[in-house]
Amino acid sequence: MSEGKREKRLTQRVPVKLKVDWKAEGTFLYENATNISEHGIFVETNDPMDPGTMIDLQFTLPESNKQIAVLGEVTWANPLRPRKEANYNPGMGIRFVNLKEIDKETILSLIKRIAVL
């Protein structure tokens, strides 16, 4: 992290490879998620929704095969910029809005397992 920038995340995020179904504003897509925390998820997409957009998410956690359905809010977006040299990780950061406690516990369990590896 460069000097002057501070990490805003309050909890640990871990790398994952998940398929995520999401829908918002009449758009229905099936994308990949590359990291997750107890508070949110990063979804790779070349055409992310704008910050503030509410999104219905559905994904299955590895190992537990637990299916999670949750409302999320886009907190930041990094759209694909094909003509730019440095355009890493196009996608959007999504904060979970109404995550059930049981689902949060399942995600935390996954995070602990991955963090130990």
Mark where each language-model region is.
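Short strand-loop-strand
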Residues: 19-51, 56, 91-93
